[in-house]
Design a protein with these regions (language model features):
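Aromatic- and charge-enriched surface segment that lines or borders ligand/interaction sites
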Residues: 1-2, 25-27, 208-210, 215-217
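Surface-exposed binding/hinge segments that line
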Residues: 2-56, 69-82, 466
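Extracellular/periplasmic solute-recognition and catalytic clefts
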Residues: 2-6, 15-16, 79-88, 130-134, ...
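Second-shell loop/turn segments in exported
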Residues: 12-14, 77, 143-148, 201-207, ...
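Short, well-ordered beta-strand elements
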Residues: 24-26, 74-76, 87, 141-147, ...
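Detector for C-terminal structural segments
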Residues: 82-87, 93, 191, 198, ...
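Append "and occasionally in soluble cytosolic enzymes with long acidic Gly/Pro-rich linkers
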Residues: 85-90, 96-99, 112, 118-133, ...
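Short helices/loops that flank or line small-molecule/ion binding pockets
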Residues: 153-164, 212-213, 333-342, 355-369
Length: 476
């Protein structure tokens, strides 16, 4: 229904009608902004009813159908499929998907597609002024073979031996392998800014993560850039806010404790963090001292929260182990040590990726952890702060808000953001939301990793400078 006050009201699609062979009319029962309409519902895939209805007798039958013979919105159709070994695409001579010019600008796109078969499209998006380049869509090959490998090592060994031309890998190539493969004759390389982030989450449902001064103090003492530049040799890019640096218009000015503590020495960071705790009502039997330089601080003793609470002993910071991700593993060791220098008993615990996910994303476990490190891959339209921090998305209720962040002002801005009809309006609201997150610190955002990729020089891409790499685009 459309009555938002009704007990059984659910925001969503009210009706969906196929008007003709190329047009679908969608009616919504809510005021949808960019995030719900243009970047979600309007981009949903459609399945051909004539073909798929024969399998729609039950969920099990539908999932069991291979789909190899299904009509596709592509210039290619499935040809051969060898389970666990390879499959091939062949050019479909009856396709309507070929040709057409696409012109890319700094902040906009123009498409002129009219091949005499498909419905003609002439559209422009964003700012279509300034420098640009144009490419004509193919396909330019008749067959594409996808060879399946059991792991990345086997895939890149096949690449090195010339058996494959490109490896589809959303994580890209690790730096040492990238450097090794770049020296192989006939190999081209590309490096792109990633559309993601690695982060540390505080559980704001339980003490001490429930205390804002504690979260701010940890954020202040954590000299991420020291670790990234001096220990990890610059292989990752420091990230303070929710927006990757490539999304230049969306990146908000850094404010709050991260701005206050930027550029401070280790001694100054420690002193500032102690001041934050004291201003927040924390007490200690002895506040300790810092000898200066790179030496560790003499940690405070007898630290208690504003209401006399004693922080738990043996708190764990879960992070992927060095074998899975040496960057987060290393960062976790430093941040746990910095928390120890503030008088908190915290240990970095290397933990399997899936174990961390089960621990922090399961509703029944939502209060059974203190800190963890993981990462997110993000979408083209950056509406992720709503998913990660809106109170109605709390993981205790099955959502992605693992910290349990609950802030009425933030929620109100989320409501406005969800209705934003223009990118400019959405950016302004997003940056207001970011300012709250800089103050409240449910996440300590850590860094972003460039996407490194390699391909054989017999493959030609229209462009290789693309957000998050070639694998996640039409280039891959």
């Amino acid at each position: 229904g459309t009555d938002e006050s009704a007990e059984d009201y659910v925001a969503g699609i009210a009706s969906l009608v196929a008007v003709d062979d190329y047009t679908v009319e969608i009616t919504l029962n809510f005021d949808a902004g960019l995030s719900a309409w243009q970047y979600r519902i309007a981009q949903a895939p459609f399945l051909n009813e004539t073909y798929w209805s024969q399998f729609a007798t039950s969920r099990e039958d539908l999932l069991a159908a291979s789909g190899a013979d299904a009509p596709v919105a592509s210039a290619f159709v499935y040809d051969k499929v060898e389970q666990g070994a390879f499959y091939t695409w062949n050019y479909d001579p009856n396709t309507m998907w070929f040709g057409g010019d696409t012109t890319i600008y700094k902040s906009g796109t123009v498409v002129e597609w009219d091949n005499g078969v498909a419905p003609a499209i002439s559209q422009s998006f964003g700012d279509t002024s300034g420098d640009s380049f144009t490419y004509t869509s193919g396909p330019y090959v008749g067959t594409v073979e996808f060879t399946l490998y059991g792991d990345q090592d086997a895939a890149y060994l096949a690449f090195q031996n010339g058996e494959v031309d490109f490896v589809l890998n959303p994580l890209g190539v690790k730096r040492n392998l990238f450097d090794q493969l770049s020296r192989v004759p006939g190999v081209e390389t590309t490096a792109n800014l990633g559309n993601g982030m690695r982060y540390m989450a505080f559980n704001t449902r339980v003490f001490p993560g429930s205390n804002k001064a504690f979260r701010q103090a940890v954020a202040c003492i954590s000299d991420k850039e020291f670790v990234l530049n001096n220990v990890l040799q610059g292989v990752a890019v420091n990230m303070d806010g929710q927006m990757p640096e490539a999304l230049t218009a969306w990146v908000a000015p850094v404010t709050g404790v991260l701005a206050d503590c930027a550029g401070l020495s280790a001694e100054e960071r420690w002193g500032k963090s102690v001041e934050i705790l004291q201003a927040g009502g924390w007490t200690a039997s002895d506040w300790g001292s810092h000898p200066g330089g790179a030496d560790r601080a003499v940690a405070p003793t007898g630290v208690k929260g504003p209401n006399g609470e004693t922080p738990p002993s043996d708190m764990l910071l879960y992070a992927p182990g060095a074998g899975y991700d040496p960057l987060r593993s290393t960062m976790s060791l430093f941040i746990a040590d910095w928390m120890q220098q503030l008088g908190f008993d915290v240990t970095a615990r290397p933990t399997g990726f899936s174990v961390i996910v089960d621990k922090v994303f399961t509703p029944e476990n939502c209060e059974d952890w203190y800190f963890y490190m993981l990462g997110w891959g993000l979408s083209a339209f950056p509406d992720h702060p709503e998913a990660f921090f809106a109170s109605y998305n709390d993981t205790c209720e099955g959502g992605y808000n693992t910290p349990g962040f609950n802030n009425a002002e933030f929620d109100a801005l989320v409501g406005e953001f969800n209705k934003a009809k223009t990118v400019a309006e959405a950016i302004a609201l997003s940056q207001q939301m970011e300012a709250i997150l800089f103050e409240e610190m449910p996440y300590l955002v850590l860094f972003n990793v460039p996407t490194l990729e390699v391909y054989r020089n017999n493959v030609s891409f229209p462009f290789t400078d693309v957000l998050d790499g070639l694998t996640g685009t039409g280039g891959g």
